[in-house]
Amino acid sequence: MSPQIKLYLNPPKNNQYYSNHDHISGSVSVDFGKPVSIKQINVSFKGFIETMTKIDPVVMRNQAALMSPMQDAKTIHTLVNIGQKVFPPENVLSAIEGDLKPFQLKEGVHEYEFQLPKVPKKPKCLSSHTKGLMTYLDKDRVRLPPSFNNDWKNMLRFDNLDLFFYSFGKILYMVEVQIELGKPKSWYRPFEKVLTEIQLVEFIPQSKDLTFKLDDKPSKEVLESFKNSNGEQEEKTSNKLQTEKATVPTNAPLVDVMTQKPDVRVYRSTYKIGLPDDDSVMWLEARSPNLRRTFRGDPIFAGGSGKFDDIYIVMMGDKALIDRLRVIPTRVQLNLLETVTYLSQGVANQNVSSLKLAEDRIPLEKRSTVLKNSWGRYVQFSSSNPNQCKWECELRLKNHPNLKKLKFNEEDYRHRGNRLYSFKSCSIKRIFSFQLLVDWDIVGFKRQSEIIVDPIQVFADRNGRNQEEALPLYVPPPSYTESTQY
């Protein structure tokens, strides 16, 4: 009968998942059914990234070669490998000279405690990266990635192709117990036997170590245009309407910056809506200072949240039409878009999915609390034609009775087995985006505005600045038994 190995891990500090400030510790219990020869027992913490990508044969080959199978691209990166020798004890090892000889242990249960070294911040595979290797890493922000797809075995089902392809990338962390037995005396079994016990663990670094660079800062030209030698805003004359924003040259062309508030970003709707005169247009804007980084439990629509609490409907065109036009919001929906990309040997595969965070129809009696034309104001007039103007009005979703209570990921949802967090690693990139949809009734015509905030950073932990002091862990009281003595 082979030895029975049991691995017991002490819970992490947050009692949910291990982080880079935890010292992974626990005990190993080995039950030997008979006397056995043991050379050493090691406990190690290991981490790996594995990605597999498929190449489209239509792209890589001609039509005549489609019948020939193509090899999948597969890549493995070693993130961490730290360990501790729990047997023989350290004082015995220091006294041994020469090669380590096996020890004879008697039958029964033997227990060994361990505490592994602190988890390093940077992945081990960096030293083995070749020059020109394609990765998703930021050069100045290289950290260990979090666990991803620990339940990948449950996704290998052809009845759901989305999950099947989603399982092609994984980041696994594990605690491994390895027992090296002594060499048997039989001539037909000349090699040592190694027994292993593996337990997967969930590892998520602190939010500061998951932060990656976002290209949402205004350029130097924009910053210089905000101020002159007198500290006043420069004025430019033009026959056309001057916008109150300067476009930021980033990867997201719909991101603007307010000239009056440089820290506020303006996220404009994807498309403009044509108004009944076929000349005037309308669009939606979300103005936020910190919409790009979202922690678990952050309010989304509540006033002062800095997310979707400052939304404006903007019209540009004929003043007479804007004065008499009534635009009615009928429905609001907020989605979280996930984009996961796997990279292997220069080939990338992408998986896209959507999560509905909120959906609510605005009842007729509540519409006046969300949008009123009396809240609107004219912000610009054309110098050549006073009838051409720009008008804006706040869409106060923060007054909506249900939306103002919404907090991001309050229930700690797991999407396809993974908590909600974004990250970049050597060969896996997980990015999220917000998608805000607003349905309109414009003089009987149904229209929809869409704002996409791409990308955003999502964190699994709560914002430390807003997090209240946690209560101590509950410790059950000792149990007592009553006995009567005569």
UniProtKB/Swiss-Prot annotation:
Gene3D superfamilies cross-referenced by the UniProt entry: 2.60.40.640
Domain of life according to the entry: Eukaryota
Keywords: Cytoplasm, Endocytosis
InterPro entries in alphabetical order: Arrestin-like_C, Arrestin-like_N
Main location class: cytoplasm
UniProt keyword Protein biosynthesis present: no
BP GO annotations: endocytosis
Cellular component GO terms, alphabetical: cytoplasm
Compartments reported by the entry: Cytoplasm
Function as written in the Swiss-Prot or TrEMBL entry: May regulate endocytosis by recruiting RSP5 ubiquitin ligase activity to specific plasma membrane proteins in response to extracellular stimuli.
Similarity comment: family membership: Belongs to the ART10 family.
Protein name per the record: Arrestin-related trafficking adapter 10
